[in-house]
Regions:
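Patatin-like phospholipase
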Residues: 1-40, 48-229
Length: 229
């Protein structure tokens, strides 16, 4: 385990996170353990497999099953209003073909933080791990893609992807007292994003009940670019 002032920050990025998963696998092979790990969206999912010390698990999910209609696809989007099937990812099928090491995860001394965007406030809420069942609900909330997934609820509060409010949560690690911070990004340094008037209009219609969320969705890409720099 590294010294207590070292933190690991993991950006999300859907299938781009396979790169991040590879970096984490190397950390595990070299027995590099950070005492504090924080992630959003796919980064939070990768972090869970990093803490359970299951080399290759994150990559296998997104490589071996990317074409599996049980896991991802527009058919599931039309039927269940979500492009990802979280019941497949966290449910019985996963336990059969790639069981998660809950004991290793629950017995780890590493601090694990997951960020999700509160739809009512447009701000990031942070959750620490509890039981595995509670964790799966938190991870679903953090990975709920805007427009492509139905809202997730925790204690009656609606949430979407943690990357909307805080894609690279370095500020949270700093606020928690960590001075040495390693950040794994899933976008190239040269990444630039142009705001889309059409997409912004869709946000305003789709999330009209949540004006703070709409504002955050519209601002999201500019914030990502600023944090990367």
């Amino acid at each position: 385990m590294l010294k207590n002032d070292a933190a690991l920050v993991l950006e999300g990025g859907a299938l781009r996170s396979v790169y991040e998963a590879g970096v984490l696998d190397v950390f595990l092979e070299k027995k590099i353990e950070f005492p504090y790990v924080i992630g959003v969206s796919a980064g939070a999912l990768n972090a869970g497999n990093y803490i359970s010390k299951q080399i290759g698990r994150s990559a296998r999910v997104n490589i071996d099953y990317v074409d599996d209609p049980r896991y991802i696809g527009f058919k599931h989007l039309l039927r269940e209003h979500s492009i990802f099937n979280f019941d497949f990812l966290f449910g019985e099928p996963t336990k059969e073909w790639m069981p998660y090491d809950e004991n290793e995860f629950l017995n780890s001394n590493q601090k694990y933080i997951v960020g999700a965007t509160n739809c009512k406030t447009g701000k990031e809420n942070y959750f620490e791990r509890h039981t595995y069942k509670e964790l799966t609900e938190i991870l679903k909330a953090s990975s709920t893609l805007p427009i492509l997934s139905e809202l997730s609820y925790i204690d009656g509060i609606p949430y979407i992807d943690g990357g909307v409010a805080n894609a690279i949560p370095i500020d949270k690690a700093i606020a928690d007292g960590y001075k040495k911070i390693v950040v794994i990004l899933t976008r190239q340094k040269e990444f630039k994003s142009k705001s889309s008037l059409f997409i912004n209009a869709v946000y305003r219609i789709y999330y009209r009940k949540y004006p703070h969320l709409v504002k955050k969705c519209v601002q999201c890409q500019n914030v990502i670019i600023r944090e990367q720099n």
